[in-house]
Regions:
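N-terminal export signals
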Residues: 1-18
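An amphipathic, aromatic/His-enriched active-site/gating alpha helix that lines ligand/cofactor pockets
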Residues: 2, 23, 50, 54-60, ...
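Compositionally biased, intrinsically disordered low-complexity segments enriched
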Residues: 17, 21, 32-33, 67, ...
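Short, glycine- and small/hydrophobic-rich beta-strand elements in well-ordered beta-sheets
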Residues: 18-20, 56-83, 121-126
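N-terminal secretory signal peptides
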Residues: 20-55, 59-65
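Short, well-ordered beta-strand segments in beta-rich or mixed alpha/beta enzyme
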Residues: 27-36, 72-100
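A broad, structure-centric signal for solvent-exposed, well-ordered loop/edge residues
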Residues: 43, 62, 71-74, 97, ...
């Protein structure tokens, strides 16, 4: 009986902690997919990835992930035709605009745009 009462008290304590937690602040997620002019060219891919890594110096970027298509199960809904992708997280749209206008981003575009034939961007506002 005591164990049950203790568990009940722990549950109540956990519920109180969950209720007291601050609300999650929405973020802006910026996901970019690049298709190279010369698909499969390792030097071009490496140069693009090196350029993307320079963007980490921009302070308003909360998180930056850089990657290539994953070796996952082939399914009709999976598009793995891109060569390189980057995913960034910002606190808000104002910070994303600061990033777009930042000299490091502008230098990246100038030094790497000759590498890609196509770029697709998905911007998302998180809900929770």
């Amino acid at each position: 009986m005591m164990a049950l009462g203790g568990a009940g008290m722990a549950l109540t304590s956990t519920q109180a902690s969950a209720q007291a937690a601050p609300p999650v602040q929405a973020k802006l997620v910026h996901h970019v997919f690049f298709w190279l002019k010369r698909p499969g060219n390792q030097a071009d891919r490496d140069q693009l990835i090196a350029g993307l890594r320079t963007l980490r110096a921009i302070a308003v970027i909360r998180d930056l992930q850089i990657g290539v298509p994953a070796s996952t199960e082939k399914r009709d809904v999976v598009d793995s035709s891109f060569d390189v992708s980057e995913l960034m997280v910002f606190d808000n749209a104002v910070d994303q605009k600061v990033y777009q206008d930042h000299e490091i981003h502008q230098a990246f575009v100038k030094s790497c745009e000759h590498l890609w034939q196509k770029v697709v961007v998905y911007d998302m506002q998180t809900l929770d």
